[in-house]
Amino acid sequence: MKQLWCAMSLMAGSLLFSVNASADTSSGALLQQMNLASQSLNYELSFVSISKQGVESLRYRHARLNNQPLAQLLQLDGPRREVVLRGTEISYFEPGLDPFTLNGDYIVDSLPSLVYSDFKRLSAAYDFISVGRTRIADRLCDVIRVVARDGTRYSFIAWLDAETKLPLRVDLLDRDGETLEQFRVVSFNVGDNVSASMETLAKANLPPQLSVPEGGDKANFNWAPTWLPQGVTEVSSSQRRLPTFDGPVESRLYSDGLFSFSININRATAASSDQLLRT
């Protein structure tokens, strides 16, 4: 769980592409099939997650048992770190910390946010561009770019298994086309044998639910940004106090369904100096 705090955070963009409507429609349909396959099939993925912080080796298993989702994300190297999804409960297990449970629909840790996006919503601000086929993990894949039309956000490239539509690789790119993060499958398995291997998790006792504090006092602010990127809407607003600030901080959280950012305002005083906090 990460809280985004910034004075203003703008999302960098990428190259723009011109494509015809039929190409966008078919690519969008493939992405929607990826979303459905990721949440309905019984499968196991061994993958690496690469970012500026380093490389992680992980295994993700997903199944549907008794008409509810069951998933496990396991770190394969170093200390055992595990995340378990059962129904709408997500439990975290990590050495040195008490295990706890939160409410949620799917595991997002180390998995690309693109997989669970609402592509019908994203189609209002993004182009979905087919760039051909290639092989990943010895599987033929459809390759699709996801690019914001106004050039204000990062872009994605997704490699979808041509048969199952599961994501086998997803790259997050900056505006210069440099890879910031990469999710890359090295082996995977699809079938009922995956659900059979997870039956013990379905019966396991999960840790207690963590009490999550309220997001702050609800408030109607007398300020608002004069410009927002296309497709971005306000998700929530709150007011709270932070140790490093005098007086309350007013916060608005925005999202386009794929990327999120917040704008936080604190009333200036005579001793205040200009500062920009960026996340």
Region annotations inferred by a language model:
Residues 92-114:
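Acidic/charged, solvent-exposed loop-and-adjacent secondary-structure segments enriched in E/D, K/R, S/T
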Residues 1-8:
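Bacterial N-terminal signal peptides that target proteins for export
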Residues 206-279:
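Short, solvent-exposed recognition patches
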